[in-house]
Amino acid sequence: MNFKRKLWWAQHRTDVYKYSTFILLFLIVTISIIYFTYSKFTSKNEMTMYETTVEPFIKNDYFIASYIDGEWSNEIPGKEDGYVVDKVVCDNGAIGTWNNDKWAILIENATKKTKCSVYFELRYIDNVIAEAPELAQGMIPVTFDDAGNAVVADTHAKWYDYEAHEWANAVLVNCADNAIKSKYFDSNNKVLASAVGKTISMDEIMQMYVYIPRYKYQLFNAENGTSNPQAINIVFESKTTAKSTGTKNGEWLTHPAFTFGDKELAGIWVGKFETSNTSELPKIVPNVSSLRDMNVSAQFNTSRLMTTTLASTYGTSTSDDSHMMKNMEWGAVAYLSSSIYGRYTNTSTCIDSGCEVWINNNSNFVTGCAGSSVSSSEASTCNAWNTATGVNASTTGNIYGIYDMSGGASEYVMGNYNDVIKNAGFDSMPESKYYDKYIGTDYYADFTKYYLGDATKETLKAKLTEENAWYGDYSKSVSSFYPWIERGSNCYDASVAGLFSFNVVYGNSYSTFSFRVVLSVL
């Protein structure tokens, strides 16, 4: 038997070596192809870059899977191909973040071999803003028809144009009603393709929002001087771009409103109108009386409902954050409005209705109204938001802007002097990310305590209180006596009301005070 085996081996040894070598090479090639398919992807334009904060891991410890419009792909789209990253999902507790500037993935908290799946979606981008708007869960992107009706937008096609002063808009519908929810969303809370082009009834809409993309601006009055109304130079940027940190005139500053706690935001969604309906079920819609007679604490608590206890009603996620507008966020809207993307056509020319946002002079505090002129006295009549005159009261001078920021109700914002609660109703101040804290001299005429970007000390025509902000709007500084900030003034204030108006108050409820909601995608 042993002799036969030896004889067989002697006769077939060469063949065995040959086929074994072939099989081994085949396995090596196959394994290599599989490995490199999952660990490295290249586009036609450039090599992707992978970074990690964990040592001693190297590139080969990560496996990257690419999905384009839901389908697996063995390559990633190029940076200029019109795709955006919808999400990055990593296993084993790792966190993946996509860097749009480098067109690369950053992997953190990896403790073992890690696979990250990157989901790319084709979305429209207008080549002006740096990133396509990040829609929160439950948001339906919309455009407006000639009658002012909200129409479900196709995010693969043009639905905003910041160069043409058409800011991105989105709505939340009543997802507590299954008939409404199933009309617009699939089981994964994605907007149905079949919903595109449908008109959304105002009865279905709970809230309307406008997108303020992340930007940096060129400092024009950074050293506690004075200035006149002007077109502010703005450059849009990605949240992964290194922040500009200028402090002097002519330098650039990434607007602070786009830093929320320890998160850098691609933009913020701002309530299109003052808040309305009830404190238990807040709405943001036109043609209704705004929600008033609430102290700051009650307003703040109401603003949080959309991403906390009432998230299922609005279709939103508790992973995102709705909150009461901060003073700095008001400033971000004001500066974008005072730019070539808002009410200027170029650096020296205003749009037809002027550079100043027109007042909402409706004495019943109806949202979205406009007076017959920029500073009309109060009246019970209303030029509605979707009329030729009504759009003059928006930040863009058209239907795509934000309303009620001049007149309407006075708006409390989350800006406070040195944690003095006064009559606001808080037991203690909320987390620091939810308000702008001002310190410095306890004097109402000292404006140096304000910050760059909040549209206060930079937009003073004279360093005096009362009618000395841009366009003669009201100006006053917080102190321990009046620790809370009010913006915009109200319908009774005529010429001192405006986008750049800032006053100070106790924080208690008033029949003329409302508030605004901001929603951040985290």
What residue spans do the PLM features occupy?
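Solvent-exposed, low-complexity, repeat-rich "mucin-like" stalks and linkers
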Residues: 62-84
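Surface-exposed interfaces of beta-sheet-rich extracellular modules
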Residues: 76-102
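Short, polar/proline-rich extracytoplasmic segments that appear immediately after membrane translocation
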Residues: 15-68, 125
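N-terminal Lys/Arg-rich, disordered targeting/topogenic segments
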Residues: 1-16
